[in-house]
Design a protein with these regions (language model features):
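C-terminal substrate-binding subdomain of Rossmann-fold SDR/epimerase-dehydratase oxidoreductases
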Residues: 1-3, 29, 33, 37, ...
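N-terminal Rossmann-like NAD(P)+-binding domain of SDR-like oxidoreductases, especially those catalyzing
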Residues: 1-200, 279, 287, 320, ...
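Active-site helix-initiating loop/hinge in glycosyltransferases
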Residues: 18, 202, 206, 235-238
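Residue-level recognition of oxygen-bearing side chains
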Residues: 79, 110, 117, 162, ...
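Generic alpha-helical secondary structure signal
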Residues: 91, 179, 209-213, 283, ...
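Proline-centered turn/helix-capping motifs that create local helix->coil transitions or kinks
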Residues: 132, 141, 150-154, 189, ...
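A glycine/serine/threonine-rich, flexible loop-to-helix segment
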Residues: 155-156, 207-215
């Protein structure tokens, strides 16, 4: 196991995408559990999905005196530069991104702005945090995605695998983030760690994700479409496991070393964070149905069969995602392990409470 070399206590931590699903959960965990921490959250609160959920997440963070929220877009360089100048963050976690594989097919511009230009602005700000001999950013942690594996046939997906065949623009932007981070780590000695998240789910999640969208449709009496005739497998990973992994990774920055060429050996790492246990989409839907009935979101006599339609695979989709989490286990002694039923129960109970208000 690696020894932690970055303390979170008393630090100023910048979290981009703080009103997002993972971002808000990460802010909450840090503010709850870390002594003297100051969390600066930035989010543009786009209407890609229901802003009420984002506002609700921010409301739950506002009670912490160590939390400061800034509404702004990471694609705006001045906003980011001003933020770094004013607060001098010691740790940066970049979770702001235009998410969604299918949306990238119809709205490519927003992916270029947020995922490429936005991330470039973060890298530049990290680079200049060392100007004038300042200590600067100790560790940049950023979200990559399991989508970088594209249609790779070899499973489980390993971070040693070649990932040069993305099947969506979203995946291509995430692979680009890893390449950009590597270049900046090499040139400017910025310790950076990329995390390839695998199908994150849980309470107060993203309404565009399958489990949430299925629930909305079933409640409205609409038909749900199950892609690839139900033969897709996904490495569903509960949000608490993702956040636990992020917090552990934040505390070990890749070490700065000098290579034989006299230049820095890039202090750069990439890890998978997934459940290491892919679930068949039909099994997933069956468990979701049972938990929605249990939480009284749907009646016991609901006719699920009449509301299911098996359809072909969609453009940009892949048949399976499956994370090899061995390096994460070896380096941090941690592996996501929340069973699907436990996670979906937490979601169903949240949904029942949230929509009954």
């Amino acid at each position: 196991m690696l020894e932690y070399n970055v303390s979170l206590e008393g630090k100023t931590i910048l979290i981009t995408g703080a009103a997002g699903f993972i971002g808000s959960n990460l802010c909450s965990k840090l503010l709850k559990e870390t002594k003297g921490v100051k969390v600066i959250g930035i989010d543009s609160i786009t209407d890609y999905y229901d802003v009420k959920i984002k506002e609700e997440r921010l409301k739950s963070l506002a009670k912490y005196e160590g939390f400061l929220f800034v509404k702004g877009n990471i694609a705006d360089k001045k906003t980011i530069d001003d933020l770094f100048a004013a607060h001098k963050p010691e740790i940066v976690v970049n979770l702001a991104a235009q998410a969604g594989v299918r949306y990238s097919i119809t709205n490519p511009q927003s992916y270029v702005e947020s995922n490429l230009i936005g991330f470039y602005n973060i890298l530049e700000a990290c680079r200049h945090s060392y100007d004038g001999g300042e200590k600067g950013v100790e560790h940049l942690v950023y979200a990559s995605s399991s989508s970088v594996y594209g249609s790779n046939k070899k499973v489980p997906y390993s971070t040693d695998d070649k990932v040069d065949n993305p099947v969506s623009l979203y995946a291509a932007t995430k692979k680009s983030n890893e390449l950009m981070a590597h270049a900046y780590s090499k040139l400017y000695d910025i310790p950076s760690t990329g995390l390839r998240f695998f199908t994150v789910y849980g309470p107060a999640g993203r309404p565009d994700m399958a489990y949430f969208g299925f629930t909305d449709k079933l409640v409205a009496g609409k038909t749900i479409q199950i892609f690839n005739y139900g033969n897709c497998k996904r490495d569903f990973t509960f949000v608490d496991d993702i956040v636990e992994g992020v917090v552990r990774v934040m505390q070990h920055a890749p070490e700065r070393k000098t290579g034989e060429d006299g230049l820095p050996v890039p202090p750069y790492k990439v890890y998978n964070i997934g459940n290491n246990q892919p679930e068949n989409l039909l099994d997933f839907v069956n468990i979701l149905q049972e938990e929605l009935v249990r939480a009284k979101v749907l009646p016991e006599d609901y006719d699920f069969e009449a509301h299911k339609q098996l359809v072909p695979m969609q453009p940009g989709d892949v048949p399976v995602t499956y994370a090899d989490t061995t390096p994460l286990e070896q380096d941090f002694g941690f592996k996501p392990a929340t069973p699907l039923r436990v996670g979906l129960r937490a979601f169903a109970e949240w949904y029942a409470g949230y929509y009954s208000k």
